[in-house]
Curated annotation (Swiss-Prot):
Keywords: Ribonucleoprotein, Ribosomal protein. It comes from Bacillus subtilis (strain 168). Signal peptide: none annotated. GO terms for biological process: translation. Disulfide bonds: none annotated. One of its GO terms (cellular component) is small ribosomal subunit. This is Small ribosomal subunit protein bS16. NCBIfam families: S16.
Length: 90
């Protein structure tokens, strides 16, 4: 089972709000998911990002692949750097 960390769209029309979820890559964007890792609100100024760092690192270490947008959000929070350091044994 290929697992991805991606955004699930929530909120009203023209007012998106996203949950960062771990889901099977074959399930639809807003369909079934395994676990919620955090939230992302691009409408708020500045954009509001809340991520459970321990959960995100756990899923990255078990092989979940983040989408491009989630990778950028993780990088801005410093999670990708911690993941790469842990992977290389630093």
């Amino acid at each position: 089972m290929a697992v991805k960390i991606r955004l699930k769209r929530m909120g009203a029309k023209k007012s998106p709000f996203y949950r960062i979820v771990v889901a099977d890559s074959r399930s639809p964007r807003d369909g079934r998911f395994i676990e919620t890792v955090g939230t992302y609100n691009p409408v708020a100024k500045p954009a509001e990002v809340k991520i459970d760092e321990e959960l995100a690192l756990k899923w990255l270490q078990t092989g979940a692949k983040p989408s491009d947008t989630v990778r950028n959000l993780f990088s801005s929070q410093g999670i990708m750097e911690k993941f790469h350091n842990a992977k290389q044994g630093k």
